[in-house]
């Protein structure tokens, strides 16, 4: 082992982020070993062994200034990152180096970012619900504690805002710890998130040990190697907290950029692309990441992942591969956003395996199904209304349409994180209130109220108050 660690090689080829390094034949690094550039902070990760002592690596950083003949040493281990309490309140990059200008991360323990998923007998399924305070999510696609949730949506329909609101509602109320992995997203959003967390005291500037969140960023201006591995860095920190017996929230924004970075790396390594240009190992790469995001008998990881949907096509291989791993899917729709209804969650497309009378209870289950039936009927009648108008509908259909439009508006809600833009204070709605409100609308107890009374309110009582003002 000492022989491998001391191994020194030299660069023989450099094409963009791909660097080929030659080592003595008896000292070949293993796949995923981290190599260090001598005289530079750059780290290379071994991806392939080409034979004759040559390995192909991906640069985890800018490869500007590299040239043939430069010396490279093998660390003899995979990339290791600091874990534990010292990471709380800090912003780190893919290698676990701090990027918040607050000095080194003084962690007692470091862990490799590549590790096996927990064994089958260690897993612990949970049926406990995680209340989010967002009506449409709690009613239609409730989250399981220790489950995996995907926020699916095209460009500009509100994935990041929904993610921020979930962090705001869950991370503050949740006594456990959170890990946020910014994978290939805008630097501005990472900056906004940090300040948002500082303002809400989830990050305590005066005493970082009191903080509740660790942040790992690999933004969209970074090389593909960084974006591909940064999700694993965040996950490793989350796993270490879980293995201490804690309940952890793991946020990923955006899982699609992880796939995209894999596509770039795959192309750079010369692999033959598969459907739509994705890497041939897409399902395997996604599975390796997702299988590690799981709850064990010791602690739990509840994961919320934003998933960009290219060209609003849910059948694209990337979102389609992600679907298979999730317990709940929150689908954001451009059509609903265009009506001015936010959060723009599609109540007919979004699903959760928790919607089962044995898990959520009969009342919740029946209310959810009744709401979906009314909305489905409205969807079927929309074409008839567009051609013939409302007057041609049967009385019961007119009633269904009126209730559906009220439900649609009542599914909207002002967010805490959007107060600056909307001017109205954010609302947190408890699950009991959500069920009571929708039950009343479906039962016809709100038929006398105008539909605009339901727009951007919290509980059903607020809708009644708003109706009085309108009338």
From Swiss-Prot:
Annotated CDD domains: ATP-synt_F1_beta_C (cd18110), ATP-synt_F1_beta_N (cd18115), F1-ATPase_beta_CD (cd01133)
Protein topology in the membrane: Peripheral membrane protein
Location(s) in or outside the cell: Cell inner membrane
Reactions accelerated catalytically: ATP + H2O + 4 H(+)(in) = ADP + phosphate + 5 H(+)(out)
Function, as annotated: Produces ATP from ADP in the presence of a proton gradient across the membrane. The catalytic sites are hosted primarily by the beta subunits.
Alphabetical UniProt keywords: ATP synthesis, ATP-binding, Cell inner membrane, Cell membrane, CF(1), Hydrogen ion transport, Ion transport, Membrane, Nucleotide-binding, Translocase, Transport
Classification via PROSITE patterns: ATPASE_ALPHA_BETA (PS00152)
The EC number(s) this enzyme carries: 7.1.2.2
The protein, known as: ATP synthase subunit beta
Family membership noted in the UniProt record: Belongs to the ATPase alpha/beta chains family.
PANTHER family found in the cross-reference section: ATP SYNTHASE, ATP SYNTHASE SUBUNIT BETA, MITOCHONDRIAL
A GO cellular component annotation in the UniProt record: proton-transporting ATP synthase complex
Domain of life: Bacteria
Species of the source: Methylibium petroleiphilum (strain ATCC BAA-1232 / LMG 22953 / PM1)
Residues at which ATP binds: 153-160
Gene Ontology MF, one: ATP binding
Assembly: F-type ATPases have 2 components, CF(1) - the catalytic core - and CF(0) - the membrane proton channel. CF(1) has five subunits: alpha(3), beta(3), gamma(1), delta(1), epsilon(1). CF(0) has four main subunits: a(1), b(1), b'(1) and c(9-12).
